[in-house]
Regions:
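Conserved "landmark" site that anchors the functional core of diverse proteins
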Residues: 1-214
Length: 214
């Protein structure tokens, strides 16, 4: 009763709202990068607000379901498909035993979220199920998901009232261009004026060496 990871994607981890209260001991908060999409995913399924989800970056995973459940996919539009057929985002999706969820690309955004009505069977570590990759802590064995991993569910599929109306208009969340804002810190004086101009105006390229920190 759970999900088998056929393909782990580029960076897929278990996340919730994070692990607070331990930063003074050297443990980062971790947690989801897009809190709004995370909360909407759980809201669509009547899940607890902080129920753990799968967060993926740039390339979604391929998952096979070993039992029935209901899921919701939010975040950027990664063109989700079930058994080769396209399915809607921001809506409750019924998954049968044996169904395969995969993603065909990235139309918008860089991160996506998959919530499960059966709850992922992930232990709570220091008050959270979030994965902290730097510390190899929490989540699924403290790491990103890999091909062949298996995650069980904690409960059987729950009945959801008004199932067909559990959907949101994706257009509300479409953004063709995103503005990144920053606040200069106390160390900015350590750089020359030309250096600051370079930082603010040059183009940046995301490589395969990126992680959740940058």
């Amino acid at each position: 009763m759970g999900i088998r990871v056929l393909k782990g994607g580029m960076l897929t981890t278990v996340q919730d709202l994070g692990r607070t209260g331990y930063q003074s001991q050297g443990f980062g908060v971790a947690g989801v990068m897009d809190v709004r999409s995370f909360k909407i995913a759980n809201l669509l399924l009547d899940n607890p607000e902080n129920e753990a989800v799968l967060e993926f970056t740039l390339m979604g995973p391929t998952l096979q379901f070993t039992s029935e459940t209901i899921i919701a996919v939010t975040g950027g539009d990664f063109l989700p498909h079930v058994n080769g057929k396209p399915v809607s985002m921001y809506t409750a999706i019924y998954m049968h035993k044996g169904d395969v969820l995969e993603f065909k690309g990235s139309r918008t955004g860089s991160r996506g979220y998959i919530a499960f009505s059966s709850y992922l069977d992930i232990p709570v570590v220091m008050g959270s199920r979030s994965t902290n990759l730097k510390c190899s802590l929490g989540g699924f064995k403290g790491r990103r998901l890999k091909d062949g991993d298996y995650i069980g569910f904690r409960i059987k599929r729950r009945y959801l009232p008004y199932f067909l109306s559990r959907t949101l208009d994706l257009d509300e969340f479409d953004q063709e261009e995103v503005t990144l804002r920053l606040v200069m810190g106390p160390q900015d004086r350590a750089f020359t004026k030309a250096g600051r101009e370079t930082f603010l105006n040059e183009e940046y390229v995301v490589t395969s060496d990126f992680d959740r920190m940058g």
